[in-house]
Swiss-Prot record:
Region feature Specificity for association with VLDL, mapped onto this chain: 271-283
PTM field: APOE exists as multiple glycosylated and sialylated glycoforms within cells and in plasma. The extent of glycosylation and sialylation are tissue and context specific.
One GO cellular component term noted in the UniProt record for this chain: very-low-density lipoprotein particle
Annotated binding of heparin, by residue: 155-158, 222-229
Protein name: Apolipoprotein E
Quaternary state and interactors: Homotetramer. May interact with ABCA1; functionally associated with ABCA1 in the biogenesis of HDLs. May interact with APP/A4 amyloid-beta peptide; the interaction is extremely stable in vitro but its physiological significance is unclear. May interact with MAPT. May interact with MAP2. In the cerebrospinal fluid, interacts with secreted SORL1. Interacts with PMEL; this allows the loading of PMEL luminal fragment on ILVs to induce fibril nucleation.
Gene that this sequence comes from: APOE
Entry superkingdom: Eukaryota
Region ranges (Homooligomerization): 259-311
Keyword flag Protease: no
Signal peptide residues on this chain, from the entry's feature table: 1-18
Amino acid sequence: MKVWWAVLAAAILAGCRAQTEQEVEVPEQARWKAGQPWELALGRFWDYLRWVQSLSDQVQEELLSSQVTQELTMLMEETMKEVKAYKSELEEQLSPMAQEHRARLSKELQVAGALEADMEDVCNRLAQYRGEAQAMLGQSTEELARAFSSHLRKLRKRLLRDAEDLQKRMAVYGAGAREGAERGVSAVRERLGSRLERGRLRVATVGTLAGRPLRERAQAWGERLRGHLEEVGSRARDRLNEVREQVEEVRVKVEEQAPQMRLQAEAFQARLKSWFEPLVEDMQRQWAGLVEKLQAAMPSKAPAAAPIENQ
């Protein structure tokens, strides 16, 4: 029984080790890598979310903490800050235009509220998943992982839909603004371009500083976990070899002692036979003597009974 437990433990450790040695891939969303500052900030939020999902279960369990929720909240606030800054700059630079253009801009940017709600939903879902994982300890980790992946897929679809909608609306309005600028607002376009460039640089700097420590920590966790699993696997293999050697020694001893045990059993059987055979013979002799006495006594009693019947 101990041998089977040791084999099962070694198989589980080997599976965990194979899972942790897979390369962590961080998918890239090309469509958010260039464009407005809010698009770059949204790309950072998107990449971080996909990166957390791509990690192994062990590293995910460590990363799904309040710190990750805070990092996502920071990226979400950075994205909405850039969207609001872009809206304020457009309103400031387009103030000479008609009032209906500014009203149209405010109406078009209302979709940014839906985008913010979706990003907040992502953070809330991560916190909910962490609580469910703690409450469902002892159940299958595969079921938790499937539920987590399903939540993220749905949230990514909503996030992508609202982001694309906002991008299309901003592109349409930006095209109108460029046409107006070409008709005489070239100064506005120059100032807006310089501010957008500064926003791109700021978002790129924030993204680099935010992403580098997380990747370094994840790599360090992966290395520590891999080393620990290798050490445990080595100890399990050594213990398994020791158990196999002990079982082999017991088997050899049993094979060596089997003939001796058979001889001892035969000798004990002969001894029992020698004990009981005299008793059986004595009982047979006594029984035969008793039968003879009974047979001898029966004829002597029969004539004595006849005179009694005649009277």
